[in-house]
């Protein structure tokens, strides 16, 4: 059995290396790169794909004979895949990287191309579109889903950090909770955490926001739990798709917006229409993205293909965060340069106001747990995980 496993995996790797050579020649005609960043990213995706195909082969018993539905069946899957992000920014690139890794690792059994937000359906309709088969799969944040209980699956204001979300999903009961939640809200969709971005900027605004008193009465774009907390803090919250924020700020439809991390916000151009910026992003210390796939499509896949997709999703969480942290450092320097030129003013929310936000948030969560059993189920699981690792985290910090 060991010989068969090694032999079949060698064949798959040889096939992948052939594809890699072809792609490298395409990307670098005449020895010249079309862009150093594109090349580096392509190499990372290919390297990840090689790891995934080996891991998936091992997990699914690659090489065992007579195991129906385990080794690759030879069936191909052409997936219609849309993400919740506009093309050009980091989140879209990460969603695209996921599809490329799956395609490469599958050896061509899976074909999929990342479509930008609203290409086929609006972002808020993506869950339903995956359920009814309009989309085969999608990447989004739980804050974009229609059920108010679900935002916590991706982020929670003054809640878990990236490493805590990663631990909860990978080593805690996060995936189990996600499975149970999806079965309850839409049994025709399977979901996995598949990416994560760094802490966000709190506000881009057309009027200075230096403290909590300044948000009172302002029209501010907000989503999910943060929108409800902002309302309690005195803001006039406006719900809109993230892709509409630039135009809304430009036209004065809103006074301020939270959108994403520095690299994504810079790419979106908010510095062009909003001369004020406020940190820290207490509303979102990170954002975990979810890969949604139609259950019928998922169950039609052989086990090896399923394992490739699951492994790609997990691997992309770490890769996205690492890349986003670097990109955000670079983007933040660009924001600081604008400030030095007198074109932007950056404010930091006072510590006492951050403590106030925490207090209001805790009160809101306690009330929501009483009225929303689904939210309570997720919240209590996350709090139990934080407590289980908290003592050591505190002891190890310096």
PLM regions: where:
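Short, low-complexity disordered leader/linker segments with a strong preference
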Residues: 1-78, 393-398
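N-terminal secretory/targeting leader peptides
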Residues: 35, 63-165, 184, 189-398
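Hydrophobic transmembrane signal anchors and adjacent membrane-proximal interface regions, especially
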Residues: 45-50, 100, 171, 258
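A gly/proline- and charged-residue-enriched helix-loop-helix capping module
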Residues: 163-181
